[in-house]
Amino acid sequence: MDIEAYFERIGYQKSSNKLDLQTLTEILQHQIRAIPFENLNIHCGKTMELSLEDTFHQIVRKKRGGWCLQVNHLLYWALAMIGFETTMLGGCVYVPSACKYSNTMIHLLLQVTISGKTYIVDSAFPFSCQLWEPLELTSGKDQPQVPAIFHLREENGTWYLEQTKRQEYVSNQEFIDSNFLEKNTHRKIYSFTLEPRTIEDFWSISTYYQVSRTSVMTNTSLCSLHTKDGVHGLMGTILAYKKFNYKDNIDLVEFKTLKEEEIEEVLKSVFGIHLETKLVPKCGNVFFTI
Protein backbone atom coordinates (compact mmCIF):
# COMPACT_ATOMS: atom_id res chain seq x y z
CA MET A 1 0.00 0.00 0.00
CA ASP A 2 1.38 3.34 -1.09
CA ILE A 3 0.57 6.66 0.60
CA GLU A 4 1.32 8.51 -2.64
CA ALA A 5 -1.32 6.40 -4.42
CA TYR A 6 -3.79 7.44 -1.72
CA PHE A 7 -2.92 11.12 -2.18
CA GLU A 8 -3.37 10.73 -5.94
CA ARG A 9 -6.76 9.06 -5.37
CA ILE A 10 -8.03 12.03 -3.35
CA GLY A 11 -6.33 14.61 -5.58
CA TYR A 12 -4.19 15.99 -2.77
CA GLN A 13 -0.90 17.71 -3.50
CA LYS A 14 0.87 18.32 -0.23
CA SER A 15 1.19 22.04 0.45
CA SER A 16 3.55 21.36 3.35
CA ASN A 17 4.88 18.57 5.52
CA LYS A 18 3.51 20.13 8.69
CA LEU A 19 1.36 17.94 10.92
CA ASP A 20 -0.99 20.80 11.72
CA LEU A 21 -4.72 21.55 11.62
CA GLN A 22 -4.52 23.02 8.12
CA THR A 23 -2.99 19.85 6.69
CA LEU A 24 -5.53 17.68 8.52
CA THR A 25 -8.40 19.80 7.19
CA GLU A 26 -7.06 19.71 3.64
CA ILE A 27 -6.79 15.92 3.67
CA LEU A 28 -10.30 15.53 5.11
CA GLN A 29 -11.83 17.85 2.51
CA HIS A 30 -10.03 16.20 -0.38
CA GLN A 31 -11.17 12.78 0.79
CA ILE A 32 -14.87 13.62 1.18
CA ARG A 33 -14.89 15.18 -2.32
CA ALA A 34 -13.16 12.21 -3.96
CA ILE A 35 -14.28 9.10 -2.06
CA PRO A 36 -18.03 8.46 -1.84
CA PHE A 37 -19.81 7.00 1.15
CA GLU A 38 -21.51 3.99 -0.46
CA ASN A 39 -22.77 0.49 0.30
CA LEU A 40 -23.29 -0.65 -3.29
CA ASN A 41 -21.39 -3.94 -2.94
CA ILE A 42 -24.22 -5.24 -0.77
CA HIS A 43 -26.67 -4.51 -3.61
CA CYS A 44 -24.36 -6.01 -6.22
CA GLY A 45 -24.15 -9.38 -4.48
CA LYS A 46 -20.70 -8.74 -3.00
CA THR A 47 -19.39 -8.33 0.54
CA MET A 48 -18.02 -5.22 2.23
CA GLU A 49 -14.53 -6.32 3.26
CA LEU A 50 -12.89 -4.69 6.29
CA SER A 51 -9.22 -5.61 6.04
CA LEU A 52 -7.00 -2.64 5.28
CA GLU A 53 -5.57 -4.35 2.20
CA ASP A 54 -9.03 -5.04 0.77
CA THR A 55 -10.19 -1.53 1.63
CA PHE A 56 -7.15 0.05 -0.04
CA HIS A 57 -7.67 -2.09 -3.15
CA GLN A 58 -11.35 -1.21 -3.40
CA ILE A 59 -11.08 2.53 -2.74
CA VAL A 60 -7.66 3.49 -4.08
CA ARG A 61 -6.97 1.04 -6.89
CA LYS A 62 -10.54 0.43 -8.09
CA LYS A 63 -11.63 4.02 -7.36
CA ARG A 64 -14.73 3.02 -5.43
CA GLY A 65 -16.07 4.31 -2.13
CA GLY A 66 -17.18 2.48 0.99
CA TRP A 67 -18.99 2.82 4.28
CA CYS A 68 -17.55 4.21 7.52
CA LEU A 69 -15.81 0.97 8.49
CA GLN A 70 -13.83 1.19 5.25
CA VAL A 71 -13.53 4.89 4.45
CA ASN A 72 -12.54 6.04 7.94
CA HIS A 73 -10.27 3.00 8.29
CA LEU A 74 -8.42 4.16 5.18
CA LEU A 75 -8.21 7.71 6.53
CA TYR A 76 -6.88 6.37 9.85
CA TRP A 77 -4.13 4.53 7.99
CA ALA A 78 -3.22 7.57 5.88
CA LEU A 79 -3.07 9.97 8.82
CA ALA A 80 -1.02 7.55 10.90
CA MET A 81 1.33 6.93 7.97
CA ILE A 82 2.27 10.60 7.69
CA GLY A 83 2.68 10.97 11.45
CA PHE A 84 -0.58 12.25 12.94
CA GLU A 85 -1.43 10.94 16.42
CA THR A 86 -4.64 9.13 15.46
CA THR A 87 -7.03 6.85 17.36
CA MET A 88 -10.08 4.90 16.20
CA LEU A 89 -13.29 5.47 18.16
CA GLY A 90 -16.70 3.79 18.01
CA GLY A 91 -20.07 5.53 17.83
CA CYS A 92 -23.75 4.72 18.33
CA VAL A 93 -25.90 6.32 15.62
CA TYR A 94 -29.12 8.12 16.51
CA VAL A 95 -32.21 6.31 15.18
CA PRO A 96 -34.98 8.92 14.64
CA SER A 97 -37.78 6.37 14.30
CA ALA A 98 -36.92 4.94 17.74
CA CYS A 99 -35.92 8.29 19.29
CA LYS A 100 -32.74 6.75 20.70
CA TYR A 101 -29.17 5.85 19.85
CA SER A 102 -28.31 2.40 18.51
CA ASN A 103 -27.74 -0.20 21.20
CA THR A 104 -24.42 -1.24 19.70
CA MET A 105 -21.38 0.55 18.34
CA ILE A 106 -21.91 0.77 14.56
CA HIS A 107 -19.94 3.83 13.44
CA LEU A 108 -16.17 4.23 13.13
CA LEU A 109 -14.77 7.74 13.66
CA LEU A 110 -11.33 9.15 14.46
CA GLN A 111 -9.65 11.17 17.18
CA VAL A 112 -6.59 13.18 16.16
CA THR A 113 -4.34 15.04 18.59
CA ILE A 114 -2.22 17.98 17.40
CA SER A 115 0.12 19.74 19.82
CA GLY A 116 -1.93 18.53 22.77
CA LYS A 117 -5.27 19.61 21.29
CA THR A 118 -7.81 16.91 20.40
CA TYR A 119 -10.09 16.84 17.35
CA ILE A 120 -12.82 14.55 16.04
CA VAL A 121 -12.37 13.63 12.38
CA ASP A 122 -14.99 11.78 10.33
CA SER A 123 -15.01 11.33 6.55
CA ALA A 124 -17.83 8.83 6.30
CA PHE A 125 -21.29 9.94 7.36
CA PRO A 126 -23.86 10.33 4.56
CA PHE A 127 -25.19 13.58 3.16
CA SER A 128 -25.25 16.84 5.13
CA CYS A 129 -24.31 15.27 8.49
CA GLN A 130 -20.78 14.97 7.09
CA LEU A 131 -18.11 17.11 8.77
CA TRP A 132 -16.12 19.36 6.45
CA GLU A 133 -13.55 20.24 9.10
CA PRO A 134 -12.15 18.54 12.20
CA LEU A 135 -14.19 19.33 15.31
CA GLU A 136 -12.54 20.51 18.50
CA LEU A 137 -13.26 18.04 21.26
CA THR A 138 -14.95 20.73 23.36
CA SER A 139 -18.32 20.37 25.06
CA GLY A 140 -21.03 22.97 24.51
CA LYS A 141 -19.34 25.02 21.78
CA ASP A 142 -21.03 25.93 18.47
CA GLN A 143 -18.69 25.01 15.61
CA PRO A 144 -20.04 26.50 12.35
CA GLN A 145 -19.08 24.73 9.14
CA VAL A 146 -20.39 24.96 5.57
CA PRO A 147 -22.99 22.15 5.90
CA ALA A 148 -24.37 23.26 9.30
CA ILE A 149 -23.48 24.32 12.82
CA PHE A 150 -22.07 21.31 14.65
CA HIS A 151 -22.08 20.85 18.42
CA LEU A 152 -20.36 18.39 20.74
CA ARG A 153 -21.58 17.89 24.28
CA GLU A 154 -20.30 15.55 26.96
CA GLU A 155 -22.27 13.80 29.70
CA ASN A 156 -20.65 11.32 32.10
CA GLY A 157 -17.92 10.34 29.67
CA THR A 158 -20.18 9.99 26.63
CA TRP A 159 -19.95 12.56 23.84
CA TYR A 160 -22.86 13.51 21.58
CA LEU A 161 -22.55 14.98 18.08
CA GLU A 162 -25.46 17.16 16.96
CA GLN A 163 -26.08 19.81 14.32
CA THR A 164 -28.30 22.80 13.63
CA LYS A 165 -29.12 23.12 9.96
CA ARG A 166 -30.47 25.88 7.74
CA GLN A 167 -33.93 26.12 6.26
CA GLU A 168 -34.34 24.36 2.91
CA TYR A 169 -35.90 25.30 -0.41
CA VAL A 170 -37.02 22.30 -2.46
CA SER A 171 -37.09 23.08 -6.18
CA ASN A 172 -39.25 20.04 -7.08
CA GLN A 173 -42.61 20.56 -5.43
CA GLU A 174 -43.54 16.89 -5.74
CA PHE A 175 -40.78 16.19 -3.18
CA ILE A 176 -41.82 18.89 -0.72
CA ASP A 177 -43.00 16.27 1.80
CA SER A 178 -40.34 13.69 0.98
CA ASN A 179 -39.08 11.47 3.79
CA PHE A 180 -35.58 12.24 2.51
CA LEU A 181 -35.92 15.78 3.88
CA GLU A 182 -34.95 16.39 7.48
CA LYS A 183 -37.96 17.99 9.16
CA ASN A 184 -36.13 19.13 12.30
CA THR A 185 -33.74 22.07 12.42
CA HIS A 186 -31.79 20.46 15.25
CA ARG A 187 -30.53 16.95 14.55
CA LYS A 188 -28.85 14.32 16.71
CA ILE A 189 -26.22 12.36 14.78
CA TYR A 190 -24.30 9.92 17.00
CA SER A 191 -22.76 9.36 20.42
CA PHE A 192 -19.30 8.03 21.22
CA THR A 193 -16.75 7.54 23.98
CA LEU A 194 -13.00 8.10 23.89
CA GLU A 195 -12.18 4.41 24.40
CA PRO A 196 -9.66 3.40 21.71
CA ARG A 197 -10.91 0.83 19.20
CA THR A 198 -9.46 -1.41 16.50
CA ILE A 199 -11.06 -2.51 13.24
CA GLU A 200 -11.54 -5.97 14.77
CA ASP A 201 -14.07 -4.44 17.18
CA PHE A 202 -16.37 -3.84 14.19
CA TRP A 203 -16.20 -7.22 12.47
CA SER A 204 -19.35 -8.70 13.98
CA ILE A 205 -21.48 -5.59 13.37
CA SER A 206 -20.18 -5.43 9.80
CA THR A 207 -21.39 -8.97 9.17
CA TYR A 208 -24.75 -8.24 10.79
CA TYR A 209 -25.38 -5.11 8.73
CA GLN A 210 -24.64 -6.98 5.51
CA VAL A 211 -27.06 -9.86 6.12
CA SER A 212 -29.82 -8.65 8.44
CA ARG A 213 -33.14 -7.98 6.73
CA THR A 214 -33.76 -5.09 9.14
CA SER A 215 -30.41 -3.39 8.47
CA VAL A 216 -30.51 0.03 6.81
CA MET A 217 -27.61 -1.14 4.67
CA THR A 218 -29.51 -4.08 3.19
CA ASN A 219 -32.74 -2.09 2.87
CA THR A 220 -31.36 0.90 0.98
CA SER A 221 -28.62 1.32 -1.63
CA LEU A 222 -26.79 4.53 -0.74
CA CYS A 223 -24.21 6.82 -2.28
CA SER A 224 -23.07 10.25 -1.06
CA LEU A 225 -20.32 12.52 -2.39
CA HIS A 226 -19.48 16.10 -1.48
CA THR A 227 -18.57 18.98 -3.77
CA LYS A 228 -17.08 22.38 -2.97
CA ASP A 229 -20.53 23.81 -2.26
CA GLY A 230 -22.85 20.90 -1.56
CA VAL A 231 -23.50 17.18 -1.57
CA HIS A 232 -24.85 14.63 -4.06
CA GLY A 233 -26.95 11.73 -2.79
CA LEU A 234 -28.41 8.59 -4.35
CA MET A 235 -30.93 6.60 -2.34
CA GLY A 236 -32.34 3.72 -4.36
CA THR A 237 -33.49 5.44 -7.56
CA ILE A 238 -33.78 8.92 -6.01
CA LEU A 239 -30.99 11.32 -6.95
CA ALA A 240 -30.60 14.44 -4.80
CA TYR A 241 -28.32 17.44 -4.60
CA LYS A 242 -28.12 19.93 -1.75
CA LYS A 243 -26.36 23.25 -2.29
CA PHE A 244 -25.42 24.71 1.06
CA ASN A 245 -26.35 28.33 1.82
CA TYR A 246 -27.27 29.13 -1.78
CA LYS A 247 -28.96 32.33 -0.58
CA ASP A 248 -30.13 34.07 2.60
CA ASN A 249 -29.14 31.24 4.95
CA ILE A 250 -31.19 28.72 2.92
CA ASP A 251 -30.05 25.43 1.38
CA LEU A 252 -31.28 24.48 -2.08
CA VAL A 253 -32.41 20.85 -2.46
CA GLU A 254 -33.07 19.25 -5.84
CA PHE A 255 -34.51 15.77 -6.41
CA LYS A 256 -34.89 13.55 -9.45
CA THR A 257 -36.34 10.07 -9.81
CA LEU A 258 -34.11 8.00 -12.07
CA LYS A 259 -35.06 5.15 -14.34
CA GLU A 260 -33.11 2.03 -13.48
CA GLU A 261 -31.25 2.16 -16.77
CA GLU A 262 -30.02 5.69 -15.92
CA ILE A 263 -28.34 4.73 -12.66
CA GLU A 264 -25.15 3.25 -14.12
CA GLU A 265 -24.34 6.46 -16.00
CA VAL A 266 -25.19 8.65 -12.98
CA LEU A 267 -22.87 6.59 -10.80
CA LYS A 268 -20.07 7.18 -13.32
CA SER A 269 -20.68 10.86 -14.05
CA VAL A 270 -21.71 12.12 -10.60
CA PHE A 271 -19.98 9.76 -8.17
CA GLY A 272 -17.07 8.46 -10.26
CA ILE A 273 -18.11 4.85 -9.63
CA HIS A 274 -17.79 2.08 -12.24
CA LEU A 275 -19.51 -1.11 -11.07
CA GLU A 276 -18.35 -4.52 -12.25
CA THR A 277 -21.62 -6.31 -11.48
CA LYS A 278 -25.24 -5.29 -11.80
CA LEU A 279 -26.68 -3.07 -9.09
CA VAL A 280 -30.16 -3.82 -7.79
CA PRO A 281 -31.24 -0.41 -6.41
CA LYS A 282 -33.35 -0.54 -3.30
CA CYS A 283 -34.94 1.97 -0.96
CA GLY A 284 -36.67 0.66 2.14
CA ASN A 285 -37.46 2.59 5.29
CA VAL A 286 -35.75 5.97 5.16
CA PHE A 287 -33.00 6.24 7.78
CA PHE A 288 -30.69 8.92 6.35
CA THR A 289 -31.95 12.29 5.13
CA ILE A 290 -30.29 14.59 2.63
Swiss-Prot record:
GO biological process, any: L-amino acid transport
Reaction(s) catalysed (UniProt annotation): an arylamine + acetyl-CoA = an N-acetylarylamine + CoA
Chain positions recorded as substrate binding sites: 106-107
Localization, UniProt: Cytoplasm
EC identifiers of the protein: 2.3.1.5
Alphabetical list of Gene3D superfamilies matching this protein: 3.30.2140.20
One Gene Ontology MF term: arylamine N-acetyltransferase activity
Active site, per annotation: 68 (acyl-thioester intermediate), 107, 122
Any one cellular-component term (Gene Ontology): cytoplasm
Functional summary from the UniProt entry: Participates in the detoxification of a plethora of hydrazine and arylamine drugs.
UniProt record similarity statement: Belongs to the arylamine N-acetyltransferase family.
Protein name: Arylamine N-acetyltransferase 3
The gene coding this protein: Nat3
